[in-house]
Amino acid sequence: MNLAEGVQVVSFGILATMLIGTALGVVLATSIVYSAFLLGGVFISIAGMYLLLNGDFVAAAQVLVYVGAVNVLILFAIMLVNKRQDFTPYPSAGIRKVLTAIVSVGLFALLSTMVLATPWAYSTTPKVGDGSIIVIGEHFFSDFLLPFELASVLLLMAMVGAIILARREYLPEVTPSGLPQTVLTLPERPRELVGAGSETQE
């Protein structure tokens, strides 16, 4: 977006504050459903960052794919398998905390090194060339073809996993005694059929 320098600074400050606030909410929220909704705010903030960098297609893809698909899939998975269970501490909780701290410190050191070593000189004059959509398409099918295909396989695995979690049990092969089998019997309601069979047996 071609905005004035002051407007860009203010917009970046608002988006950065929103990004950090929603990210902290994802981690600190007591309800996992609220965390999933706040994760949508994180994705929207990142899309705003892409808009400031003149990546309009990337921003639209961020909203459509992450907010409209991934976040909704996370919410469905949470609501399908959200079972209330009593909290039981792990016997090796101390080792887990130490490993988590080591990984966090290492990741922070790596990101800090990248921030300090990266030249941040940026020219405000936009480059004349192809649009972002054309450039992304060329890189997808040339330099980053293998990661693109791996991401497609990963999304396919996630979709299959969601279907397996959401599917219902099939009817047993043996029809319960006393329950007439007709052509109108629906296989997608097995629990009611089994319950009716047990009632007739009693």
From Swiss-Prot:
The chain crosses the membrane at residues 9-29, 32-52, 61-81, 98-118, 144-164. Gene3D superfamilies: NADH-ubiquinone/plastoquinone oxidoreductase chain 6, subunit NuoJ. It catalyses: a plastoquinone + NADH + (n+1) H(+)(in) = a plastoquinol + NAD(+) + n H(+)(out); a plastoquinone + NADPH + (n+1) H(+)(in) = a plastoquinol + NADP(+) + n H(+)(out). It is found in: Membrane. Pfam families: Oxidored_q3. Signal peptide: none annotated. Coiled coil: none annotated. GO terms for cellular component: transmembrane transporter complex. InterPro entries: NADH_UbQ/plastoQ_OxRdtase_su6, Nuo/plastoQ_OxRdtase_6_NuoJ. It is a multi-pass membrane protein. Keywords: Membrane, NAD, NADP, Plastoquinone, Quinone, Translocase, Transmembrane, Transmembrane helix. Its main location: membrane. NDH-1 shuttles electrons from NAD(P)H, via FMN and iron-sulfur (Fe-S) centers, to quinones in the respiratory chain. The immediate electron acceptor for the enzyme in this species is believed to be plastoquinone. Couples the redox reaction to proton translocation (for every two electrons transferred, four hydrogen ions are translocated across the cytoplasmic membrane), and thus conserves the redox energy in a proton gradient. This is NAD(P)H-quinone oxidoreductase chain 6. It comes from Nostoc sp. (strain PCC 7120 / SAG 25.82 / UTEX 2576).
